[in-house]
Amino acid sequence: MRTPRNRLGAILAWSTAVCLFCSAVNRSHGTEQTTGPAADMVQRLGCQRGICAVLGLPEGREAAFVTELAQGNELVLFFQSPEAAEVAQVRSAAEEAGLLGQRLFVAEGNYQRVHLADNLADGAIVSKSAAQIVKDSELLRVMRPQARTVLPDRVLEKPVADGVDSWSHVFHGPDNNPQSLDRVARAPYLTQFLAGPLFVPMPEVSVAAGGRVFRAFGHISHKANQNAMLNTLICASVYNGTILWTRPLPEGFMIHRNTMVATPEALYLADHRSCKVLKAGTGELMDEIVVPAGIADGPVWKWMALLDGVLYALAGGAEVPVSTQPSTVRGLGHWPWGMWEGHEYKDPKTNFGFGRTFFAMDPATKKVLWSHREDEHVDARGVCMDRARIFYYSPEKFLGCLDASQGRVLWRNDDRDLLAAIGPNERAQHYVTGYATTTYMKCHQDYLFFSGPQRQRLVVARATDGTLLWTKEHGNFLLVLREDGVYAAGPQEPGKGADSPTGYKFAYEDGAVLAELPMRRACTRATGSVDSVFYRAAEGTMRIGTADRSVHHIAPMRPPCQDGVIISDGMLLWGPWMCGCNLSLYGHIGLAPAGDFSFRPGSDDSRLVSLSDTTNVTPLPVTAQDWPTFQGDNGRSSRTATAIPASPTQQWSLDISAQGFPTAPIAAGGLVFCGDHQGRVWAVRARDGALQWKAHTGGAILVAPAVADGRLFAGSADGHVYAYEAATGRPLWRFRAAPADRWIPVYGKLMSTWPVAGGVVVQDGVVYAAAGIAHYDGTHVFALDAATGKVKWYNDSSGTTSPEMDHGVSLQGELSIRNGELRFVAGSVHEEARFDLATGKCLNEPVNVPSSGFPSAYYPYYPEYGPYTSLDCRLPDGRLLCYDASYEGSWQSQLSLLPAAVAAAQPRKPLARWGLQRRGQPPQGLWQKRQAQWFRGFVVHDSALVATGDEEPDAQGKHFLEALAMADGSTLWYQELPGRAVRGGVAINGTGQIFVTLENGQLLAFAQK
């Protein structure tokens, strides 16, 4: 038996929650710097990290040239060529170098169309043969602004697009109005990237400019998965999510305030010591600015803005220190609110953000242009500015205004009616209201607005003198100030439905109601784009089309609590999450304008490629005792007719993938099959572990293949379904289920926007497959003739089951067939997608409210959260073998055998098993397994079962393969495994051999002595 690999390393290689976080300031890019033609080419690119497209092999170069491009840097390479032989050579070289499916992705395709999303690549290298075909416009399409394409005779650089805007300040601008001026980021959208980190501590503050987003993460972790980012600053590409650099933040400073400003050249980041000026591209410290001596109560930066080259600030004395709070709590969902350190705001002298001195400075020379000191403390949450004036509020004392050019007081208003309307600060710190640290004052043209978690009512005052104009009850409106009116996302109110109108569009001059808006969920910030307003729905994201007030529900993800949806450089950015709300997509997510993209192009002959004779196929005998598909059958029952061996031992092992992550195994006809995340299909002889054949697809294989009628079928993350002669590996046909060849980064890998992520099921000569991730991109479901690959039916409309809400089916689970229906976990809006097997009609009823009620954490994307396999297996006599594990791996029940009468009375369980932990005492079974074990896969026979899993749900625990007697649950035999099994990663064949695939890349076989 070989030495087991470190399982954590295998997981991190796949999960960008950590793998993209591995860089740090001043760390060299990649390994040793190299020399030679490839290194020279990278130097011409001027890019050491990000995504680089490579079109064809340069004249006279071998495939190794492409792998050499990856040396001495951290580039992710996408190679494309129309030549099958060239594609095969590069795949082979990438495989040998350990880069395939990790840092080098290979696609077959002509040069007229590069298979990458718009604005995605950080560089491109074009061979002579490709340069003769591909147009400059196509190269510019896939390049991000300011990226270079190296052609044989020139270098092409993409200019910055007209009409883009930045998100330079925490609330977009110093006016605190979260309304973008970007004219490019228009609906509809397509996913641009899904990236890490997935989860981060609070608070979270973000700004963006020059194609980069800067995110600062604070001091409080409520879940263990947030600890890695405590007190950390990251810089990431807004175009592909690549983390460009990271930097630690000083402990003890509460970051949730306006003290971060981004420009294309620099990030200004202030704290309790100084304002650091960091080089935007590298994080290098270029300068440091301190509060000038003698003008303030101390060195602490309370508020900051940068406008027309002048740095404005509010400074003051030391604040309540905050302590770093890591967590040991597992899982995703929910955390406790409370009055955390300093959040009670009980002393103006030490409150977060309270200061008495404003000043303006030339940041280049550090010359103070002016300073102004107040006797009373000013609350930085109540500070904003337009191009000429700084507005500021001293709680319950006065509202004031400074001339930004000279620092003189323009007016001060302490009118009783005004102060009474604004009122004292409320407590906040509740999931419905939000954070006490939230900014509550905004300005727009001639108006000042007070609203937020701490406010009793919405208050509007005149910007010229502070005169009270109008008020509205409920102070916790989230405002977006647009030219056509004041958009106020209304508070969550108990007992009201998800589509209830608690929000409004108000007129500026008098607060007249111009329109009603659907209720928002809880505390998350509202933001605005050129044509939309975004806020949190009753889970998910609400998008209000401002032209017609139409409702569009983006179901799989919600805006992050303290940032909302950020719009910058023509892109829309979500996450990462500091909360743990139950959704389907997590992490740092980018959406791009779809432009004229055809979401429903229909099906035509171009999708199918016949690769060889499809009629004469070598038979592969499959018996009823075999395991020809994931979890044994199309219903995913994990049942077998094969008797469990009495005392097996390990027969052989095979290293399938050095980088880890094979799929679950299947077994039929004397062979064992699996796929892997490098895009390979493996066929291994069951008797001795010898390789029978191996084939490559274009993308990761995320779910086990299936065998039927002498053919093996696999769904690939490149958006295709592949068919092979199962006995020999001869390719038969390839079918593109994705509507287009459009690759994006998905949690550390490049894959299609529409991967065939749920695997395939085969029944009665028909292969069923689905392509997609998120409903708003479209979900594409096909029934194909198993012999020829020809389309029998297709459904390309289920992504929108409710035109009223513009939401529908996402693809977030393995395909199955039950009750004459094709099914899979549907991601948020619908618990399970359902399609008529004969016609492809979607059977899900429309959900005409903006609600995401069904969480998921699909194992191929989140292997650290969704690895455990729930089981409800009914035996012939009516007894029920059951095990429940929550979708995100934080809770489980005991593995139990229920008597028939008890089993018949069991209520329906949610697929996510979320909420079962609150149902009270589970029913008494005939036997229960000890709860310390966490189960990943099962093989169930009438008299015994085999289970694989973990003794403890952490990387250090033992991992096992165990057989239990069905009669009493006693252990028949127990084998310790050298790593964690993949989800559902156990199979049995007709001779009683048991096969297990491990996340560390091993395939193991066990057989009776």
Regions found by a protein language model. Name each.
Residues 89-114:
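S-adenosyl-L-methionine
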Residues 112-123:
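A short acidic, Gly/Pro-enriched loop at the edge of an enzyme's catalytic core
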Residues 200-233, 249-276, 296-359, 372-399, ...:
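Repeat-blade elements of multi-bladed beta-propeller folds
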Residues 133-147:
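A short glycine-rich, Lys/Arg-flanked "PGG" loop and its adjoining helix->strand segment in the class I
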Residues 11-23:
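Bacterial N-terminal signal peptides
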Residues 48-68, 78:
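Conserved class I S-adenosyl-L-methionine
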Residues 41, 45, 49, 105-108, ...:
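Aromatic (tryptophan-biased) beta-strands that constitute blades/sheets of beta-rich domains
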Residues 121-133:
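A short SAM/SAH-binding and catalytic strip from SAM-dependent methyltransferases
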